[in-house]
UniProtKB/Swiss-Prot annotation:
CDD domains, sorted: ASKHA_NBD_TsaD_bac
Disulphides: none
Domain of life: Bacteria
Principal subcellular localisation of the protein: cytoplasm
Job of this protein: Required for the formation of a threonylcarbamoyl group on adenosine at position 37 (t(6)A37) in tRNAs that read codons beginning with adenine. Is involved in the transfer of the threonylcarbamoyl moiety of threonylcarbamoyl-AMP (TC-AMP) to the N6 group of A37, together with TsaE and TsaB. TsaD likely plays a direct catalytic role in this reaction.
Keyword Cell cycle among UniProt keywords: no
Top-rank EC class of the record's enzyme: transferase
Organism listed in the record: Ehrlichia ruminantium (strain Gardel)
The name this protein goes by in its record: tRNA N6-adenosine threonylcarbamoyltransferase
EC number: 2.3.1.234
Entry keywords, A to Z: Acyltransferase, Cytoplasm, Iron, Metal-binding, Transferase, tRNA processing
Upper taxonomic lineage: Bacteria, Pseudomonadati, Pseudomonadota, Alphaproteobacteria, Rickettsiales
InterPro entries assigned to the protein according to its UniProt record, in alphabetical order: ATPase_NBD (IPR043129), Gcp-like_dom (IPR000905), KAE1/TsaD (IPR017861), TsaD (IPR022450)
Residues where Fe cation binds: H116, H120, D310
Length: 348
């Protein structure tokens, strides 16, 4: 185990289209946080991996220097370096890992490879006193899954998407409607002004056993409606957005109810659901989820809205959680485009 003295961790996140660096302390203080969301992808309606990698190369060094300076620390004050090592876009991961390894080598400080999904999952413990075990729903641009969080580095998957992630479907629907990228916030805003009963969309897997998801049928149904619509005006966009959001809400309520029952059958002490990832910032979906969870005698917790999307703070906190367990990495680890959370293996 690592000493209980305050630890300072430098964190680097480059798994997708955010270049982020933070300096986080083990008493839950954020000493600095820099994040640059790459605007280059907007014109393409989604993330272009090569453009993302080049942007990380252009921004990461300066962002790291600025974050260290803003924290009031120098490299000698840093106790460890935490870096996202997967899952994600391999080009960006390589750049972040190379930077972290260089700093670790020069300073002789320990390095911690962080699973991106673990970072999203454990962030809640920075803001709430929540003990293990608990249930988590990760809903983001690349992932959609339920897991039981037994401890740091110990996860059990209950269900996941069989096709698209939820954030991916939001982006694709927004692209069909020429709304721009990222699609989630725009669709949420449009849906507020629409009629959720205007169009019927299929609720895949609803009322079936388990807590897997399938969103490809919804995407196809929206495309068919858009293709057959003669006039795509603002009223149409608001109504299809509202119908889409309502459909997603129904699916989440059904799948969450099943996941709660499944988790309690495994461990009756589980009574909290954490919802995290970029889509967890959607306030309309939060309202649906919160009602459902309360009806099932559970408590639901969300990270701060601004930290639902990728950021360095979550990587730094995951580093601190791992460091507290004595989990550090050798310099020979490699970034991984795929890294299921339940496959994590730790060594101290």
């Amino acid at each position: 185990m690592v000493s209980n003295l305050l630890k300072v961790v430098l964190a680097i996140e480059t798994s997708c289209d955010e270049t982020a660096v933070a300096v986080v302390r083990s008493d839950k203080q954020v000493l600095s946080h820099k994040v640059l969301s790459q605007k280059e992808h907007v014109v393409y309606g989604g993330v272009v991996p090569e453009i993302a990698s080049r942007a990380h190369i252009n921004y990461l060094y300066d962002l790291t220097s600025q974050s260290i300076e803003e924290s009031g620390c120098d490299l000698a004050d840093i106790d460890a370096i935490a870096v996202t090592s997967g899952p994600g876009l391999i080009g960006g991961l390589i750049i972040g890992v190379m930077m972290a390894k260089a700093i670790s080598s020069v300073t002789n400080k320990p390095i911690i490879e962080v699973n991106h999904l673990e970072a999203h999952t454990l962030l809640i413990r920075m803001f709430h006193d929540i003990d293990f075990p608990f249930l988590v729903l990760i809903i983001s641009g690349g992932h959609c899954q339920f897991l039981i969080v037994h401890d740091v580095g110990c996860y059990q998957r209950l269900g996941s998407s069989l096709d698209d992630s939820l954030g991916e479907v939001f982006d694709k629907v927004a692209r069909m409607l020429n709304l721009g990228y990222p699609g989630g916030p725009i669709i949420e805003k449009k849906s507020i002004m629409g009629d959720s009963k205007s169009f019927f969309l299929p609720r895949a897997l609803i009322n079936r056993f388990g807590c897997d998801f399938s969103f490809s049928g919804i995407k196809t149904a929206v495309r068919n409606i858009v293709v057959n619509q003669k006039y795509i005006d603002n009223d149409f966009i608001c109504n299809i957005s509202a119908s889409f959001q309502d459909c997603i809400g129904d699916i989440l309520v059904n799948r969450i109810t099943n996941a709660i029952h499944m988790s309690q059958a495994i461990n009756c002490k589980i009574n909290k659901l954490v919802v995290t990832g970029g889509v967890a910032a959607n306030h309309l979906l939060r309202n649906r989820i919160s009602i459902c969870v309360k009806d099932n005698n559970f408590e639901v917790l969300y990270p701060p809205t601004e930290l639902c999307t990728d950021n360095g703070i979550m990587v730094g906190w995951a580093g601190i959680e791992n460091l507290s367990k004595g989990y550090v990495s050798n310099l020979d680890f490699v970034p991984k485009a795929r890294w299921p959370l339940e496959s994590i293996k730790r060594s101290s």
